[in-house]
Amino acid sequence: MSRQPILDIKGLRTVFRTRAREIVTVNDVDIVVNPGETVALVGESGSGKSVTSLSIMRLLARKVGFIDAGSIILRGKSGQTVDLAAIDEEAMRRIRGNDIGMVFQEPMTSLNPVYTIGDQIGEPLRVHRGTSRREALEAAVELLDRVGIPDARRRAGQYPHELSGGMRQRATIAMALICNPTLLIADEPTTALDVTIQAQILDLMQKLQSESGMGMLFVTHNLGVVAEIAQRVVVMYAGRIVESGPVKEVFRNPRHPYTMGLLRSMPRLGDATEMKRRGEKLNTIPGMVPGLANLPSGCAFAPRCSFAVEACHAAVPPLASVNEHHGSRCIRWQEIAA
């Protein structure tokens, strides 16, 4: 299998317009996704994760959000590369649902309530390949069966409200994969599901990925999910990448205080009883994510950081190389240990 990247983002900068000013929501973001690889994009709400994924798909609100700088190079099914940041909307329509599939957080809002499940899953085939409605429906039924929906033919004739939350999410996964994309973007696809269904959906996505060899950008705030599904992790804070590297290395040896704070605030099995016995509380990160319209000077995390020194407030730190595969946007990364 070719190791040329499926997705290669360099220097992505996304801006939102307000009546008063322009606000940078994603700043200088670099992400690479290889064939068969899952890269997790993590951070608190407001960190820029979802705006990054919407920028890749060019689904930003018109006249409000726009890509101001950078490139988004996609290697499609033909093997040819295209810069998604530079093409027009007509060209982008030929790529969405064909070379790139996307699974959204809440399936009830991403599925159309007035069309049957089968029609919605089959629509990308009709749009991109000119498949007949009957052939598209047969393909949809087959894929519904593959994603684990029982009695797939009957379910294909039903409407979204007639399916459970887990079934709806399986249907949106089927819709995203119907054209065999090279890249799947999954934006918090398991957040609205209970833990049992969440585990089933994660297993399903890994199985389908191993069968197709597609790359996956998995957007989440759940580090437990990251440990299970991803090979590399990109941590975002206030619109910038603050740490990136192999999941095992970053989790074992985080080199940014924000990553360390996220990991330490994760509850672990057995912790509650032991912490109660000791009279301890769950670790938290003090403060809140700053508003992107009013970022502090220097490192945006400095006001919440126990490692911060005067120099942290002077300038935005560069993304330093911890090693060939691991980067940290912290001037004190060498002093930080988990």
Swiss-Prot record:
Keywords, alphabetical: ATP-binding, Cell inner membrane, Cell membrane, Membrane, Nucleotide-binding, Peptide transport, Protein transport, Translocase, Transport
GO molecular function: ATP binding; ATP hydrolysis activity
Subcellular location, principal: membrane
EC number: 7.4.2.-
Domain (ABC transporter) ranges: 10-263
Bilayer disposition of the protein: Peripheral membrane protein
Oligomer and partners: The complex is composed of two ATP-binding proteins (BRA0404 and BRA0405), two transmembrane proteins (BRA0407 and BRA0408) and a solute-binding protein (BRA0409).
Protein name, UniProt field: Putative peptide import ATP-binding protein BRA0405/BS1330_II0402
Species the sequence originates in: Brucella suis biovar 1 (strain 1330)
